[in-house]
């Protein structure tokens, strides 16, 4: 090797790095086509968002119109059915301070109250036209003394005894059966 070529390489070594192509690595497209592509993508995204918002608004408007029309034609019984249809298939469990737990089963229209000591469980049928408030339930259940049936007398029959198997409480639903499964039931 010639000494002159070594010195030339040392003074200016070859550059093996890739040539800069800009931010986006599309080698076959010129810059003006890249910009046009970006603008088209942004416009399409904006159109999709606007169309989605319009369709969602149209759906909400249609549901509202159907509900108003059904309520005006059907009067109170439709309003009652609509109010209960929102709650159908749901249960709600509420603590009443430190004194007990209330479970409302809106599908079976049952209300269960278990006092804090857990000696018994009160069951009450809920009227479909008037769902009581939590304050009214607390007053009603706390007005009844939370005594076990042995102290109140065994006049309640088999419904006052503790449930011996899970099949006996199947008609109550899962939430109420779990709450009242191990204690005697008292129907109000």
Swiss-Prot record:
- Pfam families, A to Z: BRICHOS, SP_C-Propep
Q: Which InterPro entries match?
A: BRICHOS_dom, SP-C, SP-C_palmitoylation_site, Surfactant_protein_propep
Keyword vocabulary terms for this entry: Disulfide bond, Gaseous exchange, Lipoprotein, Palmitate, Secreted, Surface film
Q: Covalent lipidation (S-palmitoyl cysteine) residues?
A: 28-29
* Region entry Disordered, spans: 144-164
Disulfide pairs here are: 121-180
> Which residues belong to any copy of the BRICHOS domain?
94-188
One GO cellular component term noted in the UniProt record for this chain: extracellular space
Main localization (coarse): secreted
What processes does the entry annotate via GO biological process terms? respiratory gaseous exchange by respiratory system
Residues of the propeptide region, as annotated, are 1-23, 59-188
In which compartments does the protein localize?
A: Secreted, Extracellular space, Surface film
What further note is attached to this protein's record?
A: Pulmonary surfactant consists of 90% lipid and 10% protein. There are 4 surfactant-associated proteins: 2 collagenous, carbohydrate-binding glycoproteins (SP-A and SP-D) and 2 small hydrophobic proteins (SP-B and SP-C).
Q: What does this protein do?
A: Pulmonary surfactant associated proteins promote alveolar stability by lowering the surface tension at the air-liquid interface in the peripheral air spaces.
Descriptive protein name: Surfactant protein C
